Curated annotation (Swiss-Prot):
Homology family: Belongs to the fibrillar collagen family.
Sorted UniProt keywords: Extinct organism protein, Extracellular matrix, Glycoprotein, Hydroxylation, Phosphoprotein, Secreted
Protein's cellular compartments: Secreted; Secreted, Extracellular space; Secreted, Extracellular space, Extracellular matrix
Main location: secreted
Chain intervals with Low complexity compositional bias: 9-22, 33-51, 113-129, 147-165, 213-252, 372-398, 407-426, 485-494, 608-622, 635-665, 691-707, 736-745, 757-769, 900-914, 948-981
Keyword presence, Glycoprotein: yes
Region listing for Disordered, in residue ranges: 1-1014
3-hydroxyproline: residues bearing it: P709, P986, P1001, P1004, P1007
Compositional bias (Basic and acidic residues): 63-77, 915-929
Disulfide cross-links: none
Glycosylation site residues: K99, K930
Protein name, as recorded: Collagen alpha-1(I) chain
Modified residues (Phosphoserine): S105, S611
Length: 1014
């Protein structure tokens, strides 16, 4: 046969000798990269395998934002007025109570042993993106929960960002005048001067303080009247007096506006889980307060200014409950009126007999909204109530505007080459070329037998082949990013066949072979798009409450913008540096207070204000009528242990929830890099029972009962709606190294690098042995697949990027020398073959099974080590001109098997398995009697491992892949416009009078006084 030698000469066929060893493939040619072929037809989705074992729960997510508050309900019909009560005695104002600590969370149960893992199923095809759901109706407000027992104070949180400085407060009143300074020493009398000319009359000065009387001198002889002396020089200023006391503290200035929030800090590393504290001792129940008389029901009218509270009346007989009325529209919220003076506290009356609950009255028609009252002074916030049961999950909101394009992902792993097509017929011999220099090639082998034709894939539509341009003078560029798959081109017209014979007919498609052995783990793929995260477990309680901000005006909900058309994908630029936070906007001027507008849409929830002191414990009121059942509130934290209740009867089973429609499968994103293995979160609390009726109005807290024996477990209700998407958890600590993976098969040899072969270097010194890595947790052994048919050798990939130079390893043992082949005469290089026709792209192979993660081996020492495991396939190189198919040579003698390379790095996490079918609904149980809230149970012993579940049918499409890496930081936004002035806050409490300040410095000396009388 004809061919090229390494020097580029032509070889002519010589005498046929025995087959030499197969040469290495040459480096890639300098030709331009060919166009990407049309994508092949997608393969049939594989049937779903058995469900794998459930993974450990993820780390707890951060607490979600509180939901919007519901609109207040309408007041019921007014009951008959009770008799006028006697005026009570004035009560003393109670001291404000302290805010209670949050109650303990329930103790987590012990984690059960994991059951044996079922065989891993093949990943299901991704579903299409579902249409955006409509916004659900707004939930009604849940009833206020009772305050929980005080929990231990949380650890101090990190200091928040410093807010902008507020405006300076008003100047305080002037302090008291300082003490007068000490009198200076009397100066000596100067000599009498000559009489000066009389000057103009001076301004009369303020009288100075009288000086101390001097000692009486001896009486002198009366002298003659002398001339008036000249005006003496001003005396030296006296010694400064002691500083005065500080003035009284002025009233506190108005609170400045809250500064703009500081930039969000980086997420801290998750702390190690704290040790579980001991269960506290059960506290003694507090005394039951005296039940006060119920006040008369107010008449429903227009909401006006708040009047002074009237005297407390005696409890009247409970009226009959009216029938339900037609439900009116909720009126607009009026502004709270000014707080009236507190009425005198009456003496508590005797507790009346508890009346039977009346029938539910019909809610009255909604009154017209009253005029906007004046802003009242803020009341003291009450103790925090317990969080109510979770409300119904709202429907998915409208999709937001498209975000900025993400950063360019990593280059994907080169796909495996398709099956080799059938060998074409040999072309006609070319003209004999000029004999070149003798090459280093071995003798040509004799024609081998043609191998069995592999099953060709379904041929995709062949695109029109463009004319190949001349090779450019530049260097070969790096492979660009993979563009979006183009639409399949129309089948091109059959071209004129060249000198080459047409390829043989395609054989029938063979049956699907058994899965091959698990290959070596490839490098991690590019980052996938951001997936819809599953709800995380409740996170740990955050740091202590930060400083409260001012309550902002509720903004109007903006209309959802229409999603814009998808733009062309641009070239990914380098990741920019994090932009600096924008400048603080200038504070706008306070505008005039306008008339009350209509009820606005519910605004975003403002930041919680500072907790005020708890008010005094009020007298216990009479039991009220049973209210309408309210909607379920959000799920509360586990309260303190309650008294033992009576064993409840077996509850009724919940209604089986309807199975949701499977959403359309979204486009499959590229596999993201493996994230760090987070801590295994503690098992979350048991979900609330589904399909529970709305709770009634809040009753008075009863006395603590005894702890009863635990009742029988009720049947499990239907699963609740999925919770909101949890915030992204912090980066978890690195997991332990897994067991060593099996050595993979030796891959095809890569192309030789440019340059001549250098002489072998001297052996370096042997390095010290590395420290052994930590013992990994032994993984469960997967199902061993049947060995598949050995595939044909693929095309060699481009040389991958050079890795970090390894340390010098110990010199490998010399392999056994193979039998030397007979050296044949050097043949002349044959003429260059003509370009063959481009074959149709092969079918996409079925995805291989995930390899078991291997431990990361110790870094080897530098120097020539044993041959390593085959590297990951390089990026696809440019398509060179198709060469002429040569005759297949005989198989050369097998070389010595290289030692197994080190185990590859841990592969990316596999896709999430399909969701199993919903279990059958249990039989209906009897409705249980509502018992007292029991104590949170102590941690029970670990249960026995459960039996592996049976393989369910194919579930719905799995969720989207793991969240990709964060996109490049956007440029800082423009400075915001001046915001609307916020409402004038209520006046703050009057500050206390400050302590007297130090004595101020003495004032300047006054002008000299007028001369005294003679």
């Amino acid at each position: 046969s004809y061919g090229y030698d390494e020097k580029g000469g032509i070889s002519v066929p010589g005498p046929m000798g025995p087959s030499g060893p197969r040469g290495l493939p040459g480096p890639p040619g300098p030709g331009p990269q060919g166009f990407q072929g049309p994508p092949g037809e997608p393969g049939e989705p594989g049937s779903s395998g058995p469900m794998g074992p459930r993974g450990p729960p993820g780390p707890p997510g951060k607490n979600g934002d509180d939901g919007e508050a519901g609109k207040p309900g309408r007041p019921g019909e007014r009951g008959p007025p009770g008799p006028q009560g006697a005026r009570g005695l004035p009560g003393t104002a109670g001291l404000p109570g302290m805010k209670g600590h949050r109650g303990f969370s329930g103790l987590d149960g012990a984690k059960g042993d994991a059951g044996p893992a079922g065989p891993k199923g093949e990943p299901g095809s991704p579903g299409e993106n579902g249409a955006p759901g409509q916004m659900g109706p707004r939930g009604l407000p849940g009833e206020r929960g009772r305050p929980g027992a005080s929990g231990p104070a949380g650890a101090r949180g990190n200091d928040g960002a410093t807010g902008a400085a507020g405006p300076p407060g008003p100047t305080g009143p002037a302090g008291p005048p300082g003490f007068p300074g000490a009198v200076g020493a009397k100066g000596e009398a100067g000599p009498q001067g000559a009489r000066g000319s009389e000057g103009p009359q001076g301004v009369r000065g303020e009288p100075g303080p009288p000086g101390p009387a001097g000692a009486a001198g001896p009486a002198g002889n009366p002298g003659a009247d002398g001339q008036p002396g000249a005006k003496g020089a001003n005396g030296a200023p006296g010694i400064a007096g002691a500083p005065g006391f500080p003035g009284a503290r002025g009233p506190s200035g108005p609170q400045g506006p809250s500064g703009p929030p500081g930039p969000k800090g980086n997420s801290g590393e998750p702390g190690a889980p704290g040790s579980k504290g001991d269960t506290g001792a059960k506290g003694e129940p507090g005394p039951t307060g005296i039940q006060g008389p119920p006040g008369p029901a107010g008449e429903e009218g227009k909401r006006g200014a708040r009047g002074e509270p009237g005297p407390t009346g005696l409890p009247g007989p409970p009226g009959e409950r009216g029938g339900p009325g037609s439900r009116g529209f909720p009126g607009a919220d009026g502004v709270a009126g000014p707080k009236g003076p507190a009425g005198e506290r009456g003496s508590p009356g005797p507790a009346g007999p508890k009346g039977s609950p009346g029938e539910a009255g019909r809610p009255g028609e909604a009154g017209l909204p009253g005029a906007k009252g004046l802003t009242g002074s803020p009341g003291s916030p009450g103790p925090d109530g317990k969080t109510g049961p979770p409300g119904p999950a709202g429907q998915d909101g409208r999709p937001g505007p498209p975000g900025p394009p993400g950063a360019r992902g990593q280059a994907g792993v080169m796909g495996f080459p398709g099956p080799k097509g059938a060998a074409g017929e040999p072309g006609k011999a070319g003209e004999r070329g000029v004999p070149g220099p003798p090459g280093a090639v071995g003798p040509a082998g004799k024609d081998g037998e043609a191998g069995a034709q592999g099953p060709p894939g379904p041929a995709g539509p062949a695109g029109e082949r463009g004319e190949q341009g001349p090779a450019g003078p530049g260097f070969q560029g790096l492979p660009g990013p993979a563009g979006p798959p183009g639409e399949a081109g129309k089948p091109g017209e059959q071209g004129v066949p060249g000198d080459l014979g047409a390829p043989g007919p395609s054989g029938a498609r063979g049956e699907r072979g058994f899965p091959g052995e698990r290959g070596v783990q490839g490098p991690p793929g590019p980052a996938g798009p951001r997936g819809n995260g599953a709800p995380g477990n409740d996170g740990a309680k955050g740091d202590s409450q930060g400083a409260p901000g001012l309550q902002g005006m509720p903004g109007e909900r903006g209309a959802a913008g229409l999603p814009g058309p998808k733009g062309d994908r641009g070239d990914a630029g380098p990741k920019g540096a994090d932009g600096a936070p924008g400048k603080d906007g200038v504070r706008g001027l306070t505008g005039p207070i306008g008339p009350p507008g209509p009820a606005g849409a519910p605004g975003d929830k403002g930041e919680s204000g500072p907790s005020g002191p708890a008010g005094p414990t009020g007298a216990r009121g009479a039991p009220g009528d049973r209210g309408e059942p309210g909607p379920p509130g959000p799920a509360g934290f586990a309260g303190p242990p309650g008294a033992d209740g009576q064993p409840g009867a077996k509850g009724e089973p919940g209604d089986a929830g309807a199975k949701g429609d499977a959403g359309p499968s979204g486009p499959a994103g590229p596999t993201g890099p493996p994230g760090p293995i987070g801590n295994v979160g503690a098992p979350g609390p048991k979900g609330a029972r589904g399909s529970a009726g709305p709770p009634g109005a809040t009753g008075f807290p009863g006395a603590a009962g005894r702890v009863g024996p635990p009742g029988p477990s009720g049947n499990a209700g239907p699963p609740g709606p999925p919770g909101p998407v949890g915030k992204e958890g912090g980066k978890g600590p690195r997991g332990e190294t897994g067991p060593a993976g099996r050595p993979g098969e030796v891959g095809p040899p890569g192309p030789p690098g440019p340059g001549e072969k250098g002489s072998p270097g001297a052996d370096g010194p042997a390095g010290a042995p590395g420290t052994p890595g930590p013992q990994g947790i032994s993984g469960q052994r997967g199902v061993v697949g049947l060995p598949g048919q050995r595939g044909e050798r693929g095309f060699p990939g481009l040389p991958g990027p050079s890795g970090e130079p390894g340390k010098q390893g110990p010199s490998g043992s010399s392999g056994e020398r193979g039998p030397p082949g007979p050296v044949g005469p050097p043949g002349l290089a044959g003429p260059p073959g003509e370009s063959g026709r481009e074959g149709a792209p092969g079918a996409e192979g079925s995805p291989g099974r995930d390899g078991s993660p291997g431990p990361k081996g110790d870094r080897g020492e530098t120097g020539p080590g044993p041959p390593g495991a085959p590297g990951a396939p390089g990026a696809p190189g440019p398509v060179g001109p198709a060469g002429k198919n040569g005759d297949r040579g005989e198989t050369g003698p097998a070389g010595p098997a290289g030692p197994a390379g080190p185990a590859g790095a841990r592969g990316p996490a596999g896709p999430q398995g399909p969701r199993g079918d919903k279990g059958e609904t249990g039989e209906q149980g009897d409705r249980g009697i509502k018992g007292h809230r029991g104590f949170s149970g102590l941690q029970g012993p670990a249960g026995p491992p459960g039996s592996p579940g049976e393989q369910g049918p194919s579930g719905a499409s799995g969720p989207a892949g793991p969240r990709g890496p964060p996109g490049s930081a956007g440029s800082p936004g423009k400075d915001g416009l001046n915001g609307l002035p916020g409402p004038i806050g209520p006046p703050g409490p009057r500050g206390r009078t400050g302590d007297a300040g130090p004595v101020g410095p003495p004032g300047p000396p006054g002008p000299p006084g007028p001369p005294g009388p003679p």
